[in-house]
Curated annotation (Swiss-Prot):
Its EC number is 1.2.1.41. Coiled coil: none annotated. One of its GO terms (cellular component) is cytoplasm. It is found in: Cytoplasm. The keyword Secreted does not apply. One of its GO terms (biological process) is L-proline biosynthetic process. Catalyzes the NADPH-dependent reduction of L-glutamate 5-phosphate into L-glutamate 5-semialdehyde and phosphate. The product spontaneously undergoes cyclization to form 1-pyrroline-5-carboxylate. This is Gamma-glutamyl phosphate reductase. InterPro entries: Ald_DH/histidinol_DH (IPR016161), Ald_DH_C (IPR016163), Ald_DH_N (IPR016162), Aldehyde_DH_dom (IPR015590), G-glutamylP_reductase_CS (IPR020593), Glu-5-SA_DH (IPR012134), GPR_dom (IPR000965). Gene3D superfamilies: Aldehyde Dehydrogenase, Chain A, domain 1 (3.40.605.10), Aldehyde Dehydrogenase, Chain A, domain 2 (3.40.309.10). The lineage of its organism: Bacteria, Pseudomonadati, Spirochaetota, Spirochaetia, Leptospirales. GO terms for molecular function: glutamate-5-semialdehyde dehydrogenase activity; NADP binding. Belongs to the gamma-glutamyl phosphate reductase family. It catalyses: L-glutamate 5-semialdehyde + phosphate + NADP(+) = L-glutamyl 5-phosphate + NADPH + H(+).
């Protein structure tokens, strides 16, 4: 099959399925999702075998430890995927929700309801759990989805899609509801971006190169899940009892994800900077330090200006020392990707100035940047974390996979 024929076939199947999905009852959708969650747990051995193939290929390609962690599935992560699907099933169905109802002076009745977007294409890298998260969210919100995962997770994604299709077939639902792009060559993506009549939205989530590639080539509206250069500022009035746990969690708990802190900003008036740097080093973090921090911890490496713009997705951290809140804010303005910024301080006025001065998808006070996540925000899961301002900003959950239709009922009215 030629490239364009392959693309149009997949897109047409998704479009056809989307017309059925939008009419499915909430109970039917929830039943299918709960069955999927059970099947993921029941067939975990098959999932692990497929994942082992990806891990083997990853080792041969010498992927970084952070990428290998993103790729890894184990029993705990499989059960976590199943749990996320159950959470999505338990969420209120946004489809049909009335967002506005009014009777006009001329007697016309207007009711605005949420409806599915239609066909959602998501392009992502490394993490196999995204296949299930996005598939479940799209299905619950009545959308068909076209999923194109990274080549490094091909076998894992393939088995996960297979299990999803088994449930759909059993329930007599078109498997075009969840379409898997089994071509890993990036050139195959471009024809998808021309299918303006078949795909309603494209969501890329991955590295800077992927985001740029999609944005430059797509004729379809793009919601960008851009890189997460997250800044964490430790104010001079920060509580030392909070600082180390927050910083360690923000960087170390899972460094290979977009809400992990990449830049640590230290006010030179904070008295426990040395202890903080030592605690990070003890956790295995490679510290890239400015001169002031390097004087406190000579075992670190000198930071380069370019480092402050990097999304490491690894146990690496750039450190910047400032002498004022204003200097910290100016630094963040230059380095932020618009994803997440956080401050640790006991001064409420400082916290207020910090949050009022910045323009990112999420701003945190006295807590870890790792909380910028759809599940943690009560959305069940997320399609991605949008760093743009249109159509959604921050975690993209169920409601953000909808648009609205206004239904107008009259009794013979005409416009004068």
């Amino acid at each position: 099959m030629k490239e364009i024929e392959y693309v149009q076939d997949l897109c047409s199947r998704a479009k056809k399925a989307s017309k059925v999905l939008k009419q499915l009852s909430s109970s039917k959708k929830n039943k299918i999702l709960l069955s999927l969650a059970d099947l993921l747990e029941k067939r975990k051995a098959e999932i692990l075998l497929a994942n082992e193939l990806d891990l083997k290929d990853g080792k041969e390609k010498k992927l970084s430890s952070a990428l290998m962690d993103r790729l890894l599935l184990n029993e705990k992560r499989i059960f976590s995927m199943a749990s996320a699907v159950r959470e999505i099933a338990a969420l209120p169905d946004p489809i049909g929700e009335v967002t506005r109802g009014i009777t006009l002076p001329n007697g016309l009745e207007l009711v605005t309801r949420r409806v599915p977007l239609g066909v959602v294409m998501v392009i992502y890298e490394s993490r196999p759990n995204v296949t299930i998260d996005v598939g479940a969210l799209s299905f619950k919100s009545g959308n068909a989805c076209i999923l194109r995962g990274g080549s490094e997770a091909f076998y894992s994604n393939e088995i996960l899609i297979k299990l999803f299709h088994e449930i759909l077939i059993k329930e007599e639902i078109d498997i075009g509801s969840v379409v898997f792009v089994d071509k890993t060559d990036r050139s195959f993506m471009i024809p998808f971006f021309q299918q303006t009549s078949l795909i309603d939205i494209v969501v890329p989530r991955g590295g800077e190169g992927l985001i740029r590639f999609v944005s430059e080539n797509s004729k379809i509206p793009v919601v960008k899940h851009d890189k997460g250069v997250c800044n964490l500022y430790i104010d001079q009035d920060a509580d030392p009892e909070k600082v180390i746990p927050i910083v360690i969690n923000s960087k170390v708990q899972r460094p290979g994800v977009c809400n992990s802190t990449e830049n640590l900003i230290l006010h030179n008036g904070y008295p426990f900077r040395k202890e903080l740097l030592e605690a990070l080093a003890k956790e295995g973090v490679e510290l890239l330090l400015d001169p002031s921090s390097l004087a406190l911890y000579p075992k670190g490496k000198p930071v380069k200006q370019q480092d402050y713009l990097e999304e490491f997705l690894d146990l690496r951290l750039s450190v910047k020392t400032v002498s004022s809140l204003e200097e910290a804010l100016a630094f963040i303005e230059k380095t932020s990707s618009g994803h997440t910024e956080a401050i640790v301080t006991e001064d409420l006025n400082t916290a207020r100035i910090f949050t009022n001065s910045l323009d990112s998808a999420a701003l945190f006070i006295n807590c870890s940047t790792r909380f910028h996540d759809g599940g943690e925000f009560g959305l069940g899961a997320e399609v991605g974390i949008s760093t743009g301002k249109l159509h959604v900003r921050g975690p993209m959950g169920l409601v953000h996979l909808t648009t609205t239709t206004t239904y107008v009922t009259g009794n013979g009215q005409i416009r004068g």
